[in-house]
């Protein structure tokens, strides 16, 4: 069985690689994007089984959350950000209100073990 694809967007290359490595360890095939246009194009060309969004980029992660809702996306959406916990929780609630399958949110800096555990659990739920 092919590994599920995880499409992630983060404008910090080192953190994007860190997240991608955790995703690989957890059994995902990660695809990294750094710009919203690339994220949207990749999403439309090959919809992933899961998405990970950074809120703090030149394009607001909340805008991408709305994009996912407009696409009627049903896979898990993980928010990973260095913003205050209240901001993360607000973005999470917005995603839920838009009908998305929200996972997380995860605060930066991210602990590798916790991230791998979360991703492993999400992957297990995908294959059930």
Regions found by a protein language model. Give the residues of each.
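Conserved acidic segment of CheY-like receiver
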Residues: 2-14, 19-23, 51
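Alpha-helical interaction/dimerization surfaces of two-component signaling modules
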Residues: 21-26, 42, 94
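Acidic, metal-coordinating helix/loop segments flanking the phosphotransfer/catalytic sites
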Residues: 32-50
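Conserved phosphotransfer cores of two-component systems
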Residues: 44-46, 68-74, 97
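Conserved phosphotransfer microenvironments
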Residues: 52-74, 84, 88-90
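As written
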Residues: 61, 92-103
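Hydrophobic/aromatic residues positioned on beta-strands within the core alpha/beta folds
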Residues: 79-82
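C-terminal output helix
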Residues: 86-87, 107-123
């Amino acid at each position: 069985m092919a590994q599920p694809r995880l499409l992630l967007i983060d404008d910090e290359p080192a953190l994007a690689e860190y997240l991608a490595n955790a995703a690989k360890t957890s059994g995902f095939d990660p695809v990294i994007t750094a710009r919203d246009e690339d994220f949207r194009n990749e999403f439309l060309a090959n919809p992933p089984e899961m998405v990970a969004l950074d809120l703090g980029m030149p394009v607001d992660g909340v805008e991408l959350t709305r994009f996912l809702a407009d696409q009627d996306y049903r896979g898990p959406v993980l928010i990973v950000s260095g913003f205050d916990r209240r901001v993360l929780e607000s973005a999470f609630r917005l995603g839920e209100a838009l009908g998305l399958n929200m996972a997380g949110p995860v605060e930066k800096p991210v602990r590798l073990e916790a991230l791998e555990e979360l991703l492993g659990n999400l992957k297990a739920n995908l294959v059930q």
